[in-house]
């Protein structure tokens, strides 16, 4: 049986490399900013643990403080030796359960020109299995195109009019203005007249 537990700075030091292996360096948060976020409570580092063996099988980094009541699933990584065994699916179920009292869960899927073409499509299908829907956005992370998907829980998936504020609010809690300008570029979605 799997469970989820909140981790701290020691685990971040040990497992930050796992995120670096799974995510493009251009979308990585500086480790110091993540330490700051863990300290001020604006993020949680979560471990998915096998109760029987007490082994950590997956990690997630989630921005939890927001004026709007949503959380941001920033990273989810499964340990390399236990991939393709349903751990990602179980991890998502546990994350959904942990944040069931929130308005919803937001996920960002980035794409850079040199990425494998089907990579983001595969991640979209994976998230859609858990009720995530695509939100229209004008968003880039580290210069790469970012697709936003939202799992509505108590709130709405219709965040397009304020999505640029929601995303900026998450990052402003642990990134300096300089780091935000370098990493996050999100603008209000312009509606075309029909």
Model regions and ranges:
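Short amphipathic alpha-helix that is part of the acyltransferase structural core
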Residues: 1-33, 49, 161-169, 173, ...
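A conserved beta-strand-loop-helix scaffold within acyl/acetyltransferase catalytic domains
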Residues: 23-77
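Conserved N-terminal glycine/acidic-rich loop preference
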Residues: 67, 112-132
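Conserved acetyl-CoA-binding loop-helix of GNAT-fold acetyltransferases
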Residues: 78, 84-98
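Conserved GNAT acetyl-CoA-binding A-motif
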Residues: 99-118
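Conserved catalytic-core motifs of GNAT/GCN5-like acyltransferases
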Residues: 108, 124, 128-147
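Short, charged/polar, Gly/Pro-enriched secondary-structure boundary elements
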Residues: 154-159
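C-terminal lobe and adjacent flexible extensions of AdoMet/dcAdoMet transferase-like proteins
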Residues: 191-194
């Amino acid at each position: 049986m799997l469970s989820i537990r909140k981790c701290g700075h020691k685990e971040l030091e040990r497992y930050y490399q796992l995120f670096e292996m799974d995510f493009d360096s251009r979308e990585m948060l500086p480790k110091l900013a993540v330490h700051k976020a863990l300290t001020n409570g604006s993020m949680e580092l979560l471990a998915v643990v096998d109760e029987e063996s007490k082994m950590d099988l997956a990690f997630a980094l989630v921005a939890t403080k927001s004026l709007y009541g949503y959380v941001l699933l920033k990273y989810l990584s499964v340990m390399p030796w236990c991939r393709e065994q349903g751990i990602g699916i179980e991890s998502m179920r546990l994350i959904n359960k942990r944040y069931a009292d929130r308005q919803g869960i937001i996920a960002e899927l980035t794409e850079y020109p040199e990425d494998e073409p089907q990579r983001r499509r595969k991640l979209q299908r994976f998230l859609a299995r858990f009720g995530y829907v695509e939100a229209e956005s004008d968003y880039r992370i580290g210069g790469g195109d970012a697709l936003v998907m939202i799992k509505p829980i108590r709130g709405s998936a219709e965040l397009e009019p304020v999505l640029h504020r929601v995303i900026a609010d998450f990052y402003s809690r642990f990134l300096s203005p300089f780091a935000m300008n370098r990493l996050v570029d999100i603008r209000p979605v312009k509606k075309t007249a029909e």
